[in-house]
Design a protein with these regions (language model features):
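Short hydrophobic beta-strand that contains or immediately precedes a catalytic carboxylate
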Residues: 276
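Nuclease and nuclease-like effector domains acting on nucleic acids or nucleotide cofactors
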Residues: 1-273, 282-361
Length: 361
């Protein structure tokens, strides 16, 4: 137990979202899909989703009802979402293989719909609707779906559709009657985060994909502490993720329980060039206030003599680690929150590598 609630200092590690700097870059069709079965199933990460469907074909039917040819093809589509704008992009590609038999003059047709949005909410570049198809050719369009007219602190869940089929300009061929559909309904756009100048900026993610915060040798002592804390039973793995707490007052209460700034506990822990590191993070629902009587430490080198080395699923861990590393790790966490658009109550997991314990006090 700590000796009462105390104030939190301004030099606590910063963990507010940071969205300054360039947006992340990626490709529409990446190994995320290229290395998976091409079976028409979507694969998603936090800011990227894609799908490939091969071995498709449509039969060409003439006006007498006879099957006279075949159009084999593969569909590839990918969506990229940004963490600092409300415009997400989708590439839709159809690769045509060797056309067989009599195929007439087939055309590539498509229709775009963007649910519950005003006119002008998307733009399209690439193949024209109704353009002629040739064997060995690809038809590619890139759609910019725009979600930028959002009030501050708003959330939206856009649904976008690309419907497509094959027409035919040959009067002796019946145009295709069935339409394929590429539907994206798992994007979330929000305007809850701000640039350093205080301006709110929209961003979009695939909200069903849980982001992963990677701790490395860039902050070895903090990485080590988190590794040991999770190994002792605390949450943070993919199967038991943390959940972001955006309320500053609740984050401060977490810190007050785990890392008091004043009093006998703080005085006994204090070491030159070290600062108090708590896990689970103060910026998570699972922070110290969730189980204030279940504090622990993970090693004698942590210099937290008021807590014992123990294990268990609930509680929190405290370790005195290098102060500069602690501050830098807080900045990295804020950058992670911003780039992955981890908003209030979003789940996230951790991966650690390259940790090293603090020295003997």
């Amino acid at each position: 137990m700590h000796d009462g609630v105390t104030t939190v200092s301004a030099d606590d590690p910063p963990d507010d979202p940071i969205i300054d700097g360039p947006d992340t870059q990626a490709t529409f069709i990446s190994p995320l899909c290229l290395d998976q079965a091409w079976d028409g199933k979507w694969h998603a990460e936090r800011k990227h989703a894609c799908m490939i469907w091969k071995d498709l074909a449509v039969d060409v039917i003439d006006t007498k009802g006879a099957e006279v040819g075949t159009i084999p093809f593969t569909v590839k589509t990918g969506v990229l979402t940004p963490h600092k704008s409300g415009e997400f992009q989708q590439e839709f590609r159809v690769d045509f293989h060797g056309l067989t038999g009599k195929t007439g003059k087939p055309t590539f047709r498509y229709k775009l719909t963007y649910n519950n949005t005003p006119a002008g909410s998307y733009s399209v570049e690439g193949a024209d609707d109704g353009s002629l198809i040739k064997s060995g050719q690809s038809k590619v369009i890139v759609v910019k779906w725009k979600q930028q007219a959002m009030a501050d602190e708003a959330l939206k869940y856009p649904v976008v559709n690309i419907d497509w089929n094959f027409g035919n300009l040959d009067p002796e061929i019946i145009p295709g009657q069935q339409w394929g559909n590429s539907r994206v309904a798992t994007v979330r756009c929000d305007s809850t985060m701000k640039l350093s100048n205080g301006t709110s900026r929209q961003g979009c993610v695939f909200y069903g994909a849980t982001p992963e915060f990677k701790l490395t040798s860039a902050t070895p002592e903090q990485t080590w502490h988190v590794t040991e804390a999770i190994a002792s039973g605390l949450p943070g793995s993919a199967s038991r993720p943390l959940h972001r707490q955006a309320d500053k007052s609740k984050r401060d209460i977490n810190r007050q329980y785990s890392c008091p700034r004043k009093g006998a506990v703080a005085d006994a822990r204090r070491l030159t060039s070290r600062s108090c590191d708590e896990y689970p993070f103060a910026s998570s629902n699972e922070g110290a206030a969730a189980h204030p009587d279940l504090g622990r430490t993970v090693h004698d080198n942590c210099n937290v003599k008021d807590l014992t080395i123990t294990t268990g699923r609930d509680g929190y861990s405290v370790c005195m680690i290098d102060a500069k590393q602690n501050s830098h790790s807080g900045s990295l966490l804020g950058k992670f929150y911003g780039e992955e658009r981890v908003i209030d109550q979003d789940a996230f997991s951790l991966a650690t590598s390259g940790g090293a314990p603090p020295g003997i006090p």
